[in-house]
Amino acid sequence: MIRFDSPNERSRNGNLLLIGARAPVPGACKTRLGAAIGMATAAALYRAFLVDLAARFTADPAWATRNYDVAWAYTPDVDFAAVLRGCGCAAPLSPVGFVLQEGEGWGARQANLLRWGDVHGYARTVLVASDAPHLSRDDVGQAFAALERRDVVIARSLDGGYSLVGMRGYHDILSGVPMSTSSAADALVARATSLGLRVGETAAIFDIDEVADLDLLIGTLEPDGAAAPATWAALHSLGLLPETAVRRTAG
């Protein structure tokens, strides 16, 4: 079920961005990362991811030029608006939706969310996870632009999976796709192609799933963390920045 703060201001050009997210509870989010740095530390870092994504996609004054609605696709079944407020997320400047994830497994939940967009009147639906605090508005804009010419769009992650998936209408492109494997993106493309669909790809977007991904994130955000300030501050306060970056931050 979806709720927008201002129901009469929905459906910007028929485009919907869904941001998949979890309540930032230790042991229930970023567990692979938490196995290396501690579950409480991983959850604290993930809270900062949510703050940065909310600032960029729901609380930025540039919203007036955006051509898509935004909704949080959340789990578990909690008051996710309250969760975001508790994380310190800025109040949205635009109508924001909330959609509960439903289904057994991430593949089924993705399919249900993408189907939801189609059933509720969106011509194009793009789904991203909340594992990349550096995800930019340009990344999302390129995905919607690709869907003007293609039926399906993906942005690959660096591990063989994908960080973004979108489609025009709804097609069963996720059946048989092995989630969280190094062949997930290739399998999705093969499945979509077998259905006669045109697939577009945008620039790869790396996720923060493993401790090694933190080095990529830090390198992307250096020198000052301006692209994701809450995440940069959390990396600093949690002791996850290398000493050279700490000195630059302090300076």
Give the label of every model feature segment.
Residues 1-33:
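N-terminal nucleotide-binding beta1-loop-alpha1 segment
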Residues 190-251:
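Conserved alpha/beta core of the MobA/IspD/sugar-nucleotide pyrophosphorylase nucleotidyltransferase superfamily
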